[in-house]
Structure formats: structure tokens, C-alpha cells
Amino acid sequence: MTDRYILAVESSCDETSVAVLKNDNVLLTNIIASQVESHKRFGGVVPEVASRHHVEVITTCFDDALKEAQLEASDLTAVAVTYGPGLVGALLVGLAAAKAFAWANDLPLIPVNHMAGHLMAAREQGELEYPLMALLVSGGHTELVYVTEPGEYHIVGETRDDAVGEAYDKVGRVMGLPYPAGREIDQLAHQGTDTYHFPRAMMKEDHLEFSFSGLQSAFINLHHNAQQKGEELVLEDLCASFQAAVLDILLAKTKKALKQYPSKMLVVAGGVAANQGLRERLAKEITDLAVVIPPLRLCGDNAGMIALAAAVEYDKGHVADLDLNAKPSLAFESFHQQ
């Protein structure tokens, strides 16, 4: 049997990444050029800055990925690329590079949904069992996705306002923590207690929707009022109280989803899946089925996860023409409607 090699490109936000996947789930290389330091002084991602950085480094990422994988372009089977959702300018840089490379080397182009990439990063751990439920938690998305078979995604619940990762960054900014704030809030939370008892929105409703705007407002109001009165708040307890509320919401909705949709396993993926508090709660509270979480190196944005999702799409015969365009608001339901 001839080995299959898929080169994948990811540029949907502030990470420029190129990876090479061998056969079904063996990552030979996963080059990531991070822009975190460039955006830190702005307190968040600046789209124009992100696009310019992608342009500056993407060619080098291609070269490094092939060199590290010890392959030539002629060894490749296909090229995969994220075409949405994400920042339109950032997406277009990766798309242009991937399409040019595919055209120059006469390779098929595989379109990949960025969030499907996060979900399918779990494939590196081994074969997934279907149907499965997935909790996708990142800076831009909070979704419960029911996957009936490989490549068939159905959103059964999502946030009505901010994504959970965005909520972490917003309250982190209020506390004066550096961007991105998720990791530091998680670390501080482990040193504090749930003292402030923030609200947990829509916990008792039967639906699977999320909301974090009320939690953010309660946090900001508490912090502002304390400053006005000259009261000192304990940073560790603030973080612990915020994280406890977030995790209560995520766990409650996930448990409801598992009751409503027969599932053989739970996949938890996305940047926030790196949160140690979330991992601890999942291990403690969901014990009646397998919980699969990608390794930390595959939780943030990276092309390795895009390659793992692309392998599924390639097996299903999903390829795109070279007129494939960026879809910054791409949803799972429109995934194969290029």
C-alpha cells in the first residue's frame, strides 16, 4: 500500500501553520508561527496585523514543514486548507498559498472547516467511535456538535452571545492580566476558592444553548464597584469564582446533550480544552463513557488538526475547485456547500 501524505494549511486567526500528515493519523510535522506577542499590546487580535504576519511567514512555514517531514512536493497526495470560519483577510492568505501550491504541483485541494479541525484533532489519539458528542470551546466558538459519522456534523447547541474563550479574555483584561488570559486565569483559579458566586445562565433550561454575557457583566460590575469603594478583591478568588461559573455551565449543558443524544464518546476540543480545570471536572464528573481530549499541542489553532480533518474529507471524496473562497462565517451545516 502506498503511503498517503496530506499537507495542510491553517491561517484563520493569528497562527500561521503548515503540517504534513502521513496516512490516517500520523503527524510528521506541525509548524506553527505564533503572533501572540504582536497582538498582546492590543489586548486582542488585530485582523490587519494578523494578515500581514501571515504573508510574512507562510512561505517559510511551507518550506519548514516539507523539510522536517523529509518530503518533496512530488511525494504529496493532496493539499488541505482552512476556508472558514475566521478572519477573512487571514483566511485569504492561507487559501491563496494553498491553492497556488496545489495548482503548481497538480494536487487535489481539500477544503476544511476550522471547527471540524478542532474536533478531528482527537483522531490523533486513535479511532473515534460514532455517534459522538463534541464540546467545542475556543476564543470564537462555544458549540455542542453531534457527529453521527465521520464528516457529518450537526450543531445541537451554541452560545447566544460571547464564546467562552472570549469571556476569559474580557474578564482578564478587567483584572489587568496579559492577553490571552485563559491560562493565567486557570492557574490563579487553582489557588483560590469560589467566593463571589457569580450567576450561571440558563442552567435549568432544557435547551442546549449557552450564554456568558450575564456572567461577564456580573464580574465587571463587582470589580468596578469594589474599585469605587476602595475595596480590595482577592485575585485568586476572583479567578476561581469566574472559572467555577464557566465550568458549571459547560458541564451542565454537556451532560444534558449526552442524555438527549445517544453517544459512544465525548470529544472536548478547541483552545479552551487546554484548561486544566475543565479537564479535571470532565474526568471527575463524566465517567460512564470515554472522554477524548486532544493533547495540549493540538488544542490551539494548528494545521495538524486541519490535516486530521482533511483525511476524513479525502476519504469521502470531498475536494474543491481552485476558485474556493474564504467563508468567514462558515457553519457546519454549510460545510460541503462550496
Curated annotation (Swiss-Prot):
List localization entries: Cytoplasm
Task: Please list the residues that bind substrate.
Answer: L136, V137, S138, G139, G140, D169, G182, D186, N275
Molecular function as annotated in GO: iron ion binding; N(6)-L-threonylcarbamoyladenine synthase activity
Q: What Pfam families does the record point to?
A: TsaD
Keyword set for this entry? Acyltransferase, Cytoplasm, Iron, Metal-binding, Transferase, tRNA processing
Describe the reaction catalysed, as an equation: L-threonylcarbamoyladenylate + adenosine(37) in tRNA = N(6)-L-threonylcarbamoyladenosine(37) in tRNA + AMP + H(+)
Which domain of life does the protein's organism represent?
A: Bacteria
Required cofactor names: Fe(2+)
Question: In the UniProt record, which is one GO cellular component term?
Answer: cytoplasm
Which GO biological process categories is it annotated with? tRNA threonylcarbamoyladenosine modification
* Cited Gene3D superfamilies: 3.30.420.40
Q: Does the keyword Cytoplasm apply?
A: yes
Annotated residues that bind Fe cation are located at: H114, H118, D301
Q: How is the cofactor bound?
A: Binds 1 Fe(2+) ion per subunit.
The UniProt record lists the EC number as 2.3.1.234
Major localization class: cytoplasm
Q: Which HAMAP family match?
A: TsaD (MF_01445)
Which protein family is named in the record? Answer: Belongs to the KAE1 / TsaD family.
Q: What does this protein do?
A: Required for the formation of a threonylcarbamoyl group on adenosine at position 37 (t(6)A37) in tRNAs that read codons beginning with adenine. Is involved in the transfer of the threonylcarbamoyl moiety of threonylcarbamoyl-AMP (TC-AMP) to the N6 group of A37, together with TsaE and TsaB. TsaD likely plays a direct catalytic role in this reaction.
Protein's recorded name: tRNA N6-adenosine threonylcarbamoyltransferase
